A protein has these predicted regions:
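Acidic-aromatic/histidine active-site loop/patch
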Residues: 1-3, 55-61, 65, 92-95, ...
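P-loop/Walker-type NTP enzyme "switch/lid" segment
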Residues: 7-10, 36-105
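Residues at the starts of beta-strands that form the adenosine-phosphate
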Residues: 29-30, 77, 123, 141
Length: 213
């Protein structure tokens, strides 16, 4: 079994990417998608089942419902478990996650948000907003999401490389996650190119024009 953990400062981006990743992984083997935190966009929304599911993840952890009860079958290759409907209903423990990942016969498990300390063997991804590149992250990999059409990743080369983690690329507004998922699954990491001398000179000249003309 291979486990993926997807984290982000923006809930809707995380849920959408987690769903897209699970949909891709199911082509290679049976996949379980698990959400641990409820937000304005949830995994069940992407499958058209909002308000149609009785049990959630906390019900399983508190023994209110069995694994089969909380597990929603999307198709023969993909099942999912929704986040607790009531926030702070249950504090997730390492023992909870260990028990959960032993359930069923899954080749892949995708967590839509999870504390990385709760599971040992995993591949983790952090989704970064265009103008909010952090100084550091705990996750293995990261990518920039929702960048504008005029975004030039080369201008952010120093910040990206200073994070010291694997960079999967950037996603422009309105584009899908196919390229990022390809890079993630194939361990293809993006090396941000340098600006050429003439490009730097041109940018300085443009800045000078803006200031003095």
């Amino acid at each position: 079994m291979k486990v993926y953990v997807i984290n982000s400062s923006v809930d809707k981006d995380r849920a959408k990417f987690s769903t897209c990743l699970a949909n891709r992984l199911k082509e290679k083997g049976k996949t379980l998608l698990i959400s641990t935190k409820r937000s304005e966009s949830n995994i069940e929304d992407f499958y058209g089942k909002d308000g149609m599911i009785t049990y959630d993840l906390a019900d399983y952890f508190t023994d209110l419902a069995s694994f089969d009860d909380v597990c929603v079958k999307e198709d023969d290759k993909l099942n999912f478990i929704i986040a607790p409907i009531i926030s702070n209903k249950h504090d997730i423990t390492k023992e909870n996650i260990e028990k959960l990942t032993k359930e069923g016969d899954y080749k892949y498990v995708v967590f839509d948000k999870l504390d990385l300390d709760l599971i040992q063997d995993k591949k983790s991804v952090f989704i970064v907003e265009e103008n909010k590149i952090p100084a550091s992250i705990k996750e293995d990999d990261f990518f920039l999401n929702g960048v504008g059409a005029d975004f030039d990743v080369r201008l952010h080369k120093e910040k990206i490389e200073s994070i010291g983690k694997n960079f999967l690329g950037e996603v422009k507004l309105g584009d899908g996650f196919d390229k990022i998922i390809d890079n993630l699954l194939n361990d293809n990491y993006v090396v941000v190119p340098n600006l050429s001398f003439f490009e730097k000179l041109k940018m300085k000249f443009s800045k000078w024009q803006t200031l003095y003309l």
